[in-house]
Amino acid sequence: MNKLNFKQLFALVMITGLVASGCSSLNKTQKGVIIGAGAGGAVGAGVGKAAGNTALGAIIGAAVGGATGGIIGRKMDKQAEEMAKIPGAEVKRVGEGINVTFESGVLFGVDQATLNSDAQTKIKDLAAILNKNPDTYILIEGHTDNSGTSSHNMALSERRAKAVSNFLSAQNIASSRLKTAWYGESQPKVANDSESNKAQNRRVEFAIYANEKLVEEAKVEAAKG
């Protein structure tokens, strides 16, 4: 396991504490929630991995910090507010990016990797926001609980991540913006010790963060003061 320096460790404690406290207060009837968790610019992807969340790691690893990061963050604020209106979406503002989570039960049937009609509506709503804000990358992750074999769960999480990615492509999201990853049962949010916890672990996560064009534009704006 890689050792974290003091700055990384401090950021990890702050981030995980903020996210945990925010998530504990979620109301299942809410359409969405935005959780702020400023990360700082120099932390790196290792912090997210140490926290057991690679989507978080992708966002932190892409951070640039300083005035440039603040400009990017403000642009992400507006997108996150819109995304939080999508029913079933858990939306977290993390540093200079956005982490969106849908429980798999919201998107797929049991042991299935075909988006149901309601799920298609939700992902179309997400795609509409992403299309209005084209200067971002989108990482799509598939996760499962520990029911079934690890190999089955890994394959299922792969099919689900790719199903969402393909659907976004069909909504005119450029393929150059999309990246998929899948982890099966290896990255649970909570312990798989109850049906409600297992439902949380069966999920698709999105990490949305600035591309090079947005970073350069933010640098120019920051230089103007």
Can you say where each PLM-predicted feature lies in the sequence?
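Extracytoplasmic/secreted proteins, especially bacterial periplasmic and envelope-associated proteins
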Residues: 33-38, 42, 63, 78, ...
